[in-house]
């Protein structure tokens, strides 16, 4: 059995160079359970005979234990209306800082958390945002934070989920620039509304599934990002409802996959 199989367009083209070997390999699987409809089609073209698709098993991964932020930070965050920009690249930090600048007129206690994809860029991000006349604080669980802080810039690994936990909405980077997007599942599991740009080809089917469940939204322009963040911050809907939706979806995918596996085991 081949489980949660992922064949990208790039890897499919490589397999096609060895089409005879590929057919010999894939047709010998009792069942190929694909992670996406695109992968299902590629598996068929490569010679797989029995192919099933129920959804991506990444949906079924449980939440990791969050690295708690400490009492001082948690007390500060409780006084703020928070949104987060995660896995940002290049121009995306300035885009989100501009959104903050527009929204702080309406939300006096607004805090924007920025978690860049590559933390070696922190020095440049600090400089860019300071030039925008915004007050920025570099992540430090012990250092006292100015109450007027606009941007909270994270420069560490391993705490992203702790910030998702306290955010109502998350903009996921690598999607305004042509990078292909970032995996939205972690943020969705914490009940965050996901915002993304138009370039999400690496996770297109996952985003489509989240969109169908009211959990993700495309923003193609700076103005759209500002309007969408504002709308979500105004919405009093409970994130626990969204978490429950994602949990039910993951259970359905897992149970269907296990039933398929058990069916083929019993046939042996």
Predicted regions and their residues:
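Nucleotide-activated sugar donor-binding and catalytic core shared by glycosyltransferases
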Residues: 1-268
């Amino acid at each position: 059995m081949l489980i949660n199989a992922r064949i990208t367009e790039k890897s499919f083209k490589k397999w096609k160079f060895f089409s005879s070997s590929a057919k010999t390999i894939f047709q010998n699987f009792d069942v190929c359970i694909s992670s996406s409809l695109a992968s299902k089609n590629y598996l068929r073209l490569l010679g797989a005979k029995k192919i099933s698709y129920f959804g991506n098993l990444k949906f079924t991964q449980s939440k990791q234990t969050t690295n708690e932020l400490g009492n001082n930070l948690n007390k500060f965050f409780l006084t703020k209306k928070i949104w987060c920009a995660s896995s940002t690249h290049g121009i995306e930090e300035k885009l989100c800082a501009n959104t903050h600048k527009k929204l702080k007129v309406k939300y006096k206690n607004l805090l924007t958390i920025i978690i860049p994809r590559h933390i070696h860029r922190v020095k440049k991000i600090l400089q860019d945002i300071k030039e925008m006349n915004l007050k920025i604080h570099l992540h430090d669980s012990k250092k006292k934070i100015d109450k007027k802080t606009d941007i909270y810039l994270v420069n560490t690994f391993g705490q992203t989920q702790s910030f998702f936990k306290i955010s109502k909405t998350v903009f996921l980077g690598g999607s305004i620039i042509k990078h292909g997007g970032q995996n939205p599942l972690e943020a969705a599991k914490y009940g965050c509304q996901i915002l993304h740009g138009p370039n999400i080809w690496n996770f297109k089917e996952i985003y489509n599934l989240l969109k169908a469940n009211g959990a993700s939204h495309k923003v193609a322009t700076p103005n759209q990002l500002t309007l969408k963040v504002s709308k979500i911050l105004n919405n009093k809907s409970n994130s626990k409802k969204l978490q429950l939706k994602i949990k039910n979806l993951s259970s359905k995918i897992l149970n269907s996959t296990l039933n398929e596996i058990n069916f083929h085991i019993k046939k042996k």
